[in-house]
Amino acid sequence: MPDAIAPDGSEIYFLVGDARRASLVEVRLAAGQTSKPVRHRTVEEIWYFLAGEGRVWQQCPGEAEEVKEVAPGSVLTIRTGCAFQFQAGPRTQLRFLCYTSPPWPGDQEAEAVTHGGIAVSGDEEVGQP
């Protein structure tokens, strides 16, 4: 069982929560699923991919949209204020470490955005029947 469900719908497993300036969790997204698109108000994250394959969409203010393919060993940064969305490949769960600075302040940190950059059918998005 996950420790929490993130505002984007992914599963969260706490690894380090007692640090003062950062936090570390493992994030999991089931095979074939797509997260809800969100942006963070105050935190920056570094993601290190452990297992699975997938895609990550990002759009930072004043910059072009970008979609990156990810696999074990991939690393990327989610800067403060950038909209993002991620998707697990069709065959395996996507798992990554998420280092957050400052530490995750709570669900109010994530702000829903009106669109994402990964096209999904209604049953692929997390939280959909």
Model-based region annotation:
Residues C60-T80:
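Short acidic-glycine-tyrosine-enriched beta hairpin
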Residues K36-V38, V56-Q58, I78, A83-P90:
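Short beta-strand His + acidic residue motifs that chelate non-heme Fe in jelly-roll/DSBH
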Residues F14, L24-R28, I46, V67, ...:
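Conserved hydrophobic/aromatic beta-strand scaffold that supports enzyme active sites
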Residues T42-R55, Q59-C60:
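Glycine- and acidic-residue-biased ligand/ion/polar-headgroup-sensing regions
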Residues I46, T77, R91-Q108:
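A short hydrophobic beta-strand segment most commonly corresponding to one strand
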Residues R20, T42-V43, E53, C82-A83, ...:
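A generic "binding-loop/recognition-motif" signal
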